[in-house]
């Protein structure tokens, strides 16, 4: 079952993220406070997947009014390759479409081979003409998964 993500899902979602290799987490944006802020801004584009009450998948997305952005897509390793990730993505894409968004983007680490294959299978294309840049405005610590 896929349902909207709630703030009280945080501890289970964070535990899920830690179980998945290749997640890009940090101690500021992915803290309980950081995720709470994200959910306040994007309440209708963040979802979890459950089986018999066990949280086994999650996806977060938002938009800037023009483009959608997908973040932190994860399915517990013991439940991967069963269509759960695809269902989460399709759910979030439909939610973005309902908000008038016509295109979406995401970032995947180059070393995340399984993640890149997953997104390619779903029709997401790689852009070789772009360089992704970012700048931290506060001190934060990266959390490796």
Regions found by a protein language model. Name each.
Residues 1-15:
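A short beta-loop-alpha structural element at the N-terminal edge
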Residues 36-48, 69:
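A short helix-loop-beta-strand connector motif used in the catalytic cores of GNAT acetyltransferases and
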Residues 48, 54-62, 69-74:
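Conserved beta-strand in the GNAT
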Residues 50, 73-80, 108-109:
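A short, internal acetyl-CoA/4′-phosphopantetheine-binding micro-motif in the GNAT/acyltransferase core
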Residues 62-71, 80, 126-130:
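A conserved beta-turn-beta hairpin within the catalytic core of GNAT-like acetyltransferases
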Residues 75, 81-94, 121:
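Conserved acetyl-CoA-binding loop-helix of GNAT-fold acetyltransferases
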Residues 96-108:
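Conserved GNAT acetyl-CoA-binding A-motif
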Residues 106-115, 134-137:
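Conserved beta-strand-loop-alpha-helix junction that forms the acyl-donor binding cleft
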């Amino acid at each position: 079952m896929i349902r909207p993500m709630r703030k009280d899902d945080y501890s289970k979602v964070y535990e899920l993220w830690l179980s998945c290799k290749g997640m890009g987490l940090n101690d500021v944006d992915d803290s309980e406070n950081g995720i709470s802020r994200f959910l306040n801004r994007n309440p209708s584009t963040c979802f979890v997947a459950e089986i018999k009450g066990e949280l086994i998948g999650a996806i977060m997305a938002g938009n800037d009014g023009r483009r959608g952005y997908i973040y932190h897509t994860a399915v517990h390793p013991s439940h991967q390759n069963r269509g759960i990730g695809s269902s989460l993505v399709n759910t979030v894409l439909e939610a973005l479409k309902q908000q008038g968004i016509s295109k979406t983007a995401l970032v995947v680490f180059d070393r995340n081979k399984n993640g890149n294959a997953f997104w390619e299978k779903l029709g997401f294309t790689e852009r070789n003409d772009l360089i992704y840049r970012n700048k931290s405005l506060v001190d934060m610590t990266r959390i490796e998964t």
